Amino acid sequence: MDGSADPFLLALNFAALALPTLIISGPAGVRTDRVGCERVLVQSQWALLAAAGLGALAIPLFDGMAQVILLLSSTLLVGIAGAYELTARNKYCSILVGPKQLGSYLTSFSVVFNVGKLVGPPIGGWLLAATGPTWALGIDAASYLLPIASVMFFLRPDSTREIRSTNGKNAGLTNAWRECGPTLQGVLTLTAVLCLVGFFHPGLAPLIAFEVLGGKPTDLGLFTSVLAAGSIAGGLVLQRNSAQFSYRPFLTLGGFGVITAIAQLGMSRSPGVAFSLAMAFLIGAGTAGLLSSCNLITQIGSDQVMRGRMAGLSQIAFLGGGGLSGLLVAAVVVSSNLSTAFALCGGISLVVALRWIATRCKATLAPIRSA
């Protein structure tokens, strides 16, 4: 990790993973609803394996600019395949469990994902030190075989509950947006705005860690682990209160937005390392709660026939917004500094979140309409 790393290069790497959702998530959702979530899920997991394998091959076979291009291409392909995987997995959950368990089951994925983020950096660092980059990336690629085997051989979904869309104009993403209703439209809009303003820490984590902790590789691991620990905490809170939180969607989303905004403002005036790590914990909790809440609310509040497309719209809101956020904040960092970027984003996010809470906090989500 080098403090002189170009913020735009860091943001571009995350954008390569996140921005494909703006283009791919819509078609991914449409395909999931048309051909079936299990089929798309397996296909996307094989694609993830191939894309990650491409990155593993880049290290021993290429060097210089060719290696950089191949690694960025691998990241881009992982982002594309991941958009299909996440879309299909969300709808797949609804045929694995019943309606009463769906909310808790969906939010459990956030917890599991963030546990992976907590233990992943130290495991990845150990693999890198013990085996080198080629084997480390190769093992990472091979890890995709486990979920493939789970879906193909171990999980037993009730496929009779899945409702597929038919070909035609009513099966598109635009139709899902119109039919989901004003509450879910508002949920997607608020999530997109908050992510566009403040979801930049995944891409700029190396730069933030350098400013807060220092330039040692272990400092980045510590920073990302604290973020992940906060994300786990936010996910657990949402999981244990999924019914109550989803009933008041704008109060929930706005509340998580306020937590993130206050933490970002704290980062802009951090008096020390301990305080900065505490703020990083809150940023992890707030953003995880926001993203998981959006996913939860749009799934349980929509009909089974459009849940693939709603998952696609959710991805566009938070990953598309996040990919753009990193690039915008990188421009602020280059023109001023990181503290200014935190202050600006935290202030805007706080105003946006409080305004939505003030105007729509009483809005409620209709009960689950289908299994």
Segments (PLM) and residue ranges:
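Small-residue hotspots at the loop-to-helix junctions and early N-terminal turns
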Residues: 4-11, 107, 217-224, 312
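Helix-loop junctions at membrane interfaces in 12-TM secondary transporters
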Residues: 57-74, 266-279
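A single, central transmembrane helix in multi-pass transporters
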Residues: 131-138, 175-237, 339
